[in-house]
From Swiss-Prot:
Its biological purpose: Involved in efficient integration of the N-module into mitochondrial respiratory chain complex I.
GO biological process annotation, one example: mitochondrial respiratory chain complex I assembly
Top-level taxon: Eukaryota
GO cellular component: mitochondrion
Origin organism lineage: Eukaryota, Metazoa, Chordata, Craniata, Vertebrata
Organism: Xenopus laevis
Protein name from the UniProt record: LYR motif-containing protein 2
Cystine crosslinks: none
Length: 87
């Protein structure tokens, strides 16, 4: 009796990390939408997309967690800059 899961199914840990990565990407995209200048907004959208695509093949858990932490810090920096620009 074989497993019903496809051979490429993610483990629970991989699934949770994937959800973290996707959540971070969504938060970055939402933050970038708030940037007033169209050229700056497009530049940062392209940058975020390229960064996530470039690291898509990463498989080491420690490296992925470090990239998530780095992305969260950059997102916080962007959110702070947007708050300062609004005030």
């Amino acid at each position: 009796m074989g497993s019903r899961l496809p051979p490429a199914a993610l483990t629970l840990k991989q699934f949770l990390v994937r959800q973290q990565v996707l959540g971070l990407y969504r938060r970055i995209v939402r933050a970038v939408r708030q940037i007033p200048g169209a050229a700056d907004r497009q530049y940062l959208q392209d940058w975020a997309r390229d960064e996530f695509r470039r690291n898509k093949g990463a498989s080491e858990e420690i490296a992925i967690r470090m990239m998530i932490s780095h992305g969260q810090r950059q997102l916080q920096e962007l959110e702070r800059a947007l708050q300062l620009a609004k005030s």
